[in-house]
Amino acid sequence: MNIKSFPVNPLSENCYVVSDETREAVIIDCGAYYDDEKAMIAKYIRDNDLKPVAHLLTHAHFDHFWGADYIAELYGLPPRCPQPDRPLYDDVDEQVRSILHYSIRCANPPAGEDITPESVITFGSHRLTVIPCPGHTPGGVCYYCEEEKVLFSGDSLFQNSIGRTDFPGGDLWTLIDALKALIKTLPGDTTVYPGHGLKTTIAAEHRNNPYLFG
């Protein structure tokens, strides 16, 4: 599995392009805002002769789908959003105002098939399963590849921290409970690719993350 991270937009969100030897790929959380960021992602896909087959959202905060209109136009892939987060996605203008307290351009194309706990995403010879992880948003999820021991955690789990819960729909203890269950379930050598910041491992977070003690 090949994982390419693109830190994008003013909030330094991590967009991931995940591919394998078949050259099929999934795009996770394309928050590209500036034209040069969008071009950089497209160039990587083109230079590596990749075929994107899905655009997945870990949750529906605007900084994670700023580039969704570009991906939909270029590859014909509407973003797939966790079902409980559809109200956030559909009313993005109100979401932006409530979080930033001012308006900013954020085009959101019609969403594709909802992501549910039963969803299984396949690309090439790999599959991603959905692990619900609410708390940062009502419908936040992680995407897990058991074969490669890789977790894409969105804004639920960060290196030595967790996602904010003071936005509309957030709940601190819901998130902590979900993450404590998560780290008890997954192998310690699972690599965690978060929505912002550096990658980590489940073992490191079990050992060092102050929100997950006990």
Regions of interest found by a model, annotated:
Residues M1-N48, C142-S153:
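Conserved beta-strand hairpin/beta-sheet module of binuclear metal-dependent hydrolase folds
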Residues F6, V18, S119-S125:
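Short acidic-hydrophobic surface loop/beta-edge motif
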Residues F6-P7, P110-G112, P132-P134:
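Short Gly/Pro-enriched turn/cap motifs at secondary-structure boundaries
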Residues Y16, E113, E118-S119, V141, ...:
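Residue-level detector of beta-strand structural context in well-folded domains
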Residues V18, T58, C133:
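Conserved S/T- and glycine-rich ATP-binding loop of Class I adenylate-forming
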Residues A32-Y33, E94-S98, H126-G214:
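Metallo-beta-lactamase
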Residues Y33-D36, A42-T122, R207-Y211:
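Active-site HxH/HxHxD metal-binding segment of metal-dependent hydrolases
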